[in-house]
Amino acid sequence: MPRRRAPTTPEDLALWRDHGIRVRHLSPAEHAALHRAVPKPKPKPLAAPLETVNARLKARPFEPHREPMTPTACDLVAVVFALVEEHEQRLGVRCRKRRPADAASFKATVTALVSDLVHQLLSDPDGTLTVPRRKGQLGERKNRYDAWFLGETFPRTLDQMGDAGFLIQHKGAWHYGTFGRQSFKTVIEAGPALVATIGQYPDLTTADFALGEGRETIVLKWSNNHPDARLRGRKVDYDDTPETIRMRGEMTTLNDWWAGADLSLSPGHSPEAPVNLSRRTMSRIFSAADPTFGLGGRLYHSFWIIMPTEDRAALLIGREPVVSLDFGSAFLRMAYGRAGEPVPAGDLYAVGKLAEWPRDIVKPVANAMLDDRTKIDDPGAVSGLRRWPSDIQARLKEEWPAHPGLAVVRAVIEREHAPIRSMFYRGVGMEFQALESRIIVAVLLALRSMGVVGLPVHDCIIVPKKHEAAAKELMMIEFRKVAKAEAEVRRA
């Protein structure tokens, strides 16, 4: 067999490289010189069609736990599934019948895709869904957050439904843009066949679909601002304990209660954005730099959480106007309760010298001092919080142009709240948020036992105005029980 001649020119080296041939007859210096001489092709941006770009801008993640909940929705899903199977048989895609486990997985996949596509189309006709197609991602070990049927056959099901006209795919790709190499996820939207099928059910609404019991409602995750970018926002798998089982049972009770609640908007009110009144299943999310069930735990994912304040004020519960109640100076009061000290009278963000300064600045600084972990990370530190909180930096010049500086503000807060000074800069804020979420859940369950629907918005509870006094009393009782301090409850 003739011996290959070693490349001696940049053109020869480029030819060898294009054919995957390794250069074995050059010294390292000669090899490097030839590589430098060969011009490197510049990556060209991938020109995505305008409709694909728009689809990605409007996309939300696919929700695999959405299910049909009414006879109408179940009938629609069954019709679509039968048509997909018929299309598969007509094309002769499969030579053998699926095994029972594979058949169940295929049916669950089609059901979830149809349910979420229909739900998205009814709630926001211009919206789309992002879906995974990467084999490595779909082949990863399943945890408590994953749908059992999402596996390596998922892209094949997407393609089959796309071929049958029930969905349109805008496939993801690597893209060279302003910030270098970036990837875009695949997005899908309802196809013409699905739109035509939906047209046969004029009474179909988003309320015909809901999240099934398979979705985890007790979520443990890394914080979104974690120092390690690989961990930011990632969910953490965990083993169940009596505590997690109890919390999940509480969320099931509340979610079932909200699912049957009479929630609506005031007649004549035009919301800023479409409101999906069927989005009522909430989860408790425990998110922190070092995630545990003692940090965080607020409730998320319902439609009233993401509503603008103006739209939320137009909510009706049982056709009744509502009022929002929240705790005043909650974290500072919890700090006094933990220290076993009496809580000062009045607004804790306006004690002494603090009353002369803008409350909207003092409040986030005081809470940030409780969140700050400087004395945990450096036990020898005498202070912490070296920068203004990010949420007030932009408005600091407008609202307080003559401020004395962060160091002075910190010192005055420490002086005015001397009994709890030892708790600043020790990262207790997320612990207090966990206590606060415990109080909120306890109040919601107590309201339910009275037949009253309460809707949580972080540290606030929305109730019918006629039940304001009862809700306020319950909030005071539960706060005293959990935080060991007296609460201040007021209208938000």
Stretches with model-predicted labels:
Residues 326-327, 366, 453-465:
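Catalytic palm active-site di-aspartate
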Residues 33, 51-55, 74-147:
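Short amphipathic alpha-helical interface segments
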Residues 425-450:
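C-terminal accessory/binding modules appended to enzymatic or scaffolding proteins
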